């Protein structure tokens, strides 16, 4: 989702109706999904070799299924479905087989700020992602929680002067999956930063977190990141959500240059974790 998509999600803009889904699409299913710190392995089960599909097919007749192994440098089980969609789209345009395209997936380089793993030798796992809506939280948290052997921490906020109704939902969803939630500035714009974050905290408290025990409001994002890093230990996973690839934090009277990945790397360096 780009900036336009993020703005639409934040403002609650009306959705645009998608065209009707064709009835002769390929059957595809991801099985044996194994998501690890730096990547993803799964098997793509499909009823054909490419995206082409007979116009006149008999749904009663049994179909033969292929099983294709896929490996990617993209953590997060949900990326299995993104990869299958991409393979199908490219196959439909180029005519290449699913097997040919699956073999190319390991060469795909992750986009900056999309499930970006930062490893400077610190004992905990650190992930930076763009997730900033309730639906994206529901997507990103479950697979990470499933493979987390320790505690999960997350740092996030919400866009100011945007959809207010999503804020408590963000807090509630994060609290269901994370052991500790730290609320920090995203883009408060003209709103009071702390009051904005308190609206998110309402949902987190509803889900069982307690303020200043496992729920914290630290509106200065740089400070919030450093406080979370101090808490995290071996086996824990820290998620920095919402800013991702963006290069600033917007306040009422000024815009502050900001790079989430650089900030995280600097914070780790201050703790002695460097290349």
Language-model segments: residues:
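Short beta-strand or tight-loop elements
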Residues: 26-29, 38, 221
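Active-site regions of enzymes building and remodeling cell-envelope glycoconjugates
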Residues: 10-19, 23-29
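Acidic-glycine-rich active-site phosphate/pyrophosphate-binding loop
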Residues: 32-66
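ATP-dependent carboxylate-amine ligase
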Residues: 3, 7-12, 53-55, 65, ...
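C-terminal accessory "lid"/substrate-recognition subdomains
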Residues: 16-18, 31-33, 41, 78-79
């Amino acid at each position: 989702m780009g900036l336009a998509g993020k703005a639409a999600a934040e403002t609650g803009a009306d959705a645009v109706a998608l065209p009707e889904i064709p009835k002769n699409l390929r059957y595809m299913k991801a099985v044996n999904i194994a998501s690890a710190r730096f990547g993803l392995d799964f098997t793509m089960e499909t009823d054909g070799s490419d995206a082409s599909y007979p116009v006149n097919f008999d749904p009663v007749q049994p179909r033969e299924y292929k099983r294709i192994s896929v490996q990617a440098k993209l953590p997060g089980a949900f990326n299995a479905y993104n990869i299958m969609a991409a393979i199908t789209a490219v196959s439909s345009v180029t005519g290449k087989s699913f097997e040919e395209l699956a073999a190319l997936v390991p060469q795909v380089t992750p986009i900056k700020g999309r499930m970006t793993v930062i490893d400077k030798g610190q004992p905990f796992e650190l992930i930076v992602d763009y997730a900033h809506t309730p639906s994206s939280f529901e997507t990103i948290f479950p697979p990470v929680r499933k493979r987390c052997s320790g505690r999960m921490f997350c740092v996030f906020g919400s866009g100011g002067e945007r959809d207010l109704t999503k804020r408590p939902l963000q807090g509630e969803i994060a609290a269901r999956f994370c052991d500790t939630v730290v609320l920090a500035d995203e883009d408060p714009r003209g709103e009071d930063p702390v009051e904005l974050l308190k609206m998110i905290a309402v949902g987190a408290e509803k889900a069982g977190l307690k303020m200043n025990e496992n729920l914290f409001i630290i509106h200065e994002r740089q400070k919030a990141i450093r406080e979370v890093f101090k808490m995290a230990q071996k086996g824990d996973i820290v998620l920095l959500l919402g800013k991702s690839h963006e290069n600033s934090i917007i306040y009422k009277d000024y815009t502050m240059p900001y790079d989430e990945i650089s900030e995280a790397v600097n914070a780790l360096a201050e703790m002695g974790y460097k290349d």
